[in-house]
């Protein structure tokens, strides 16, 4: 889908660049596949802010998206493509041959009326699902499982994908968008194709108010705060903080490594950080 620009009637309109969503379904979502979603405003059960700069925004309902795709060898037809406020990608409503409805992540080049299927050996075409070990090397995939049967966790944002670049015994080697190469078990499943809405990265919000509609509040700098609020706070006049940049909780920011999960290090063949040097 193309990008939309607007006549510069206001500064916000002048800078606004949106994805043209005119081809998407304009009605309400399927009620059986939606549930209520309560806004937390970034507060936890004690009422304290646990996530800063969240709150407000338009009320949303959650669409239950099927990331597992575990109805094996039951063909499904794409009924329509829909907007989902909970994610950057579009979703597709599919109807299985037995009459069941489900929402899935819509891949690129999936159209209304297409037939998709999940199985051990299926055609390599967008929307089909099969174990990574049965896919040809070089296949573009998204919604990749990390644990067998848990449901897709990798490559789910708009326009993202991963590529199968090799095999290693029971595992396959997957190259992610970040440049990281990692081992994933061959029995983990993935969906063929790249995620829809690749133009999302080229959009421009245009004005602060539109960000407020999305539920984001103003982001304050630490150096503009008082010492009680941030390690960079305080000082007479404008100061640069006087110490190496840290988070509000005193941990070094600007590139300090925080990953501690050593048990899964063996699955990462090429770090996304090493690639950038």
From Swiss-Prot:
Q: Which InterPro entries match?
A: NA-bd_OB-fold, Rib_uL2_dom2, Ribosomal_uL2, Ribosomal_uL2_bac/org-type, Ribosomal_uL2_C, Ribosomal_uL2_CS, Ribosomal_uL2_dom3, Ribosomal_uL2_RNA-bd_dom
Q: Which GO terms describe its cellular component?
A: large ribosomal subunit
Q: What is the lineage of its organism?
A: Bacteria, Pseudomonadati, Pseudomonadota, Alphaproteobacteria, Hyphomicrobiales
State the residue spans of region: Disordered: 222-277
What does the protein in this record do?
One of the primary rRNA binding proteins. Required for association of the 30S and 50S subunits to form the 70S ribosome, for tRNA binding and peptide bond formation. It has been suggested to have peptidyltransferase activity; this is somewhat controversial. Makes several contacts with the 16S rRNA in the 70S ribosome.
The UniProt keyword set, sorted, is: Ribonucleoprotein, Ribosomal protein, RNA-binding, rRNA-binding
Sample GO molecular function, one term = rRNA binding
> Which terms under GO biological process does the entry name?
cytoplasmic translation
Q: How does it assemble?
A: Part of the 50S ribosomal subunit. Forms a bridge to the 30S subunit in the 70S ribosome.
* Name of the protein: Large ribosomal subunit protein uL2
One short Pfam name that applies is Ribosomal_L2
Give the family this protein belongs to, as stated in its UniProt record.
Belongs to the universal ribosomal protein uL2 family.
């Amino acid at each position: 889908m193309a990008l939309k620009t607007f006549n510069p009637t206001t500064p916000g309109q002048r800078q606004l660049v949106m994805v043209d969503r005119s081809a998407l379904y304009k009605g309400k979502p399927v009620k059986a596949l939606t549930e209520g979603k309560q806004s937390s405003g970034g507060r936890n059960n004690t009422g304290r802010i646990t996530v800063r700069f969240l709150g407000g925004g338009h009320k949303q309902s959650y669409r239950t998206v099927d990331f597992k795709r575990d109805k094996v060898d039951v063909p499904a037809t794409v009924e329509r493509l829909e907007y989902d406020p909970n994610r950057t990608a579009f979703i597709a409503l599919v109807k299985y041959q037995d009459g069941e409805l489900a929402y899935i992540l819509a891949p690129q080049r999936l159209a209304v009326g297409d037939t998709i299927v999940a199985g051990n050996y299926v055609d390599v075409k967008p929307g089909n699902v099969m174990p990574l070990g049965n896919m040809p090397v070089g296949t573009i995939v998204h919604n990749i499982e990390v644990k067998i049967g848990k449901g897709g966790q990798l490559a789910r944002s708009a326009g993202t994908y991963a590529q199968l670049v090799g095999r290693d015994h029971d595992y396959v080697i997957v190259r992610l968008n970040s440049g990281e190469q990692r081992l994933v078990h061959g029995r983990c499943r993935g969906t063929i194709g790249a995620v829809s809405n690749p133009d999302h990265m080229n959009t421009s919000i245009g004005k602060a108010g539109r960000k407020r509609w999305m539920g984001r509040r103003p982001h304050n700098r630490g150096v503009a705060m008082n010492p009680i609020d941030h390690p960079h706070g305080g000082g007479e006049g404008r100061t640069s903080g006087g110490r190496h940049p840290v988070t509000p909780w005193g941990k070094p920011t600007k590139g300090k490594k925080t990953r501690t999960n050593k048990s899964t290090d063996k699955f990462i063949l090429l770090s996304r950080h090493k690639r950038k040097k």
